[in-house]
């Protein structure tokens, strides 16, 4: 499995998990976050390996569709880059640093 795809799916899952069904959440989390094989997930849920594969592929598409419409992950990346640039340019500005910490904590809320 490609590490870039795994990282992206894990990130998209963090942003959009609440929009998925329980089954979709379980399969994606086991497959990407916990590194279960399709066979292990199939055994765990008493379904075929093909059923797990199909569900994961559909859920990947759903996550990508959510990102295309909502841009939560890509916006988060841009905000993080801007915060880093501000902190680098104004390292001694305590007010800016405090405000960025507040904004970052809002972004990282669960």
From Swiss-Prot:
Fetch the HAMAP family from UniProt: UPF0122 (MF_00245)
Q: Which Pfam families does the record match to this protein?
A: UPF0122
Question: Quick one: signal sequence residues?
Answer: none
InterPro entries noted in UniProt: RNA_pol_sigma_r3/r4-like, UPF0122, UPF0122_fam_protein, WH-like_DNA-bd_sf
As for family, the record states: Belongs to the UPF0122 family.
Q: Could you name the domain of life of the organism this protein comes from?
A: Bacteria
Record function comment: Might take part in the signal recognition particle (SRP) pathway. This is inferred from the conservation of its genetic proximity to ftsY/ffh. May be a regulatory protein.
Q: What is this protein called?
A: UPF0122 protein SP_1288
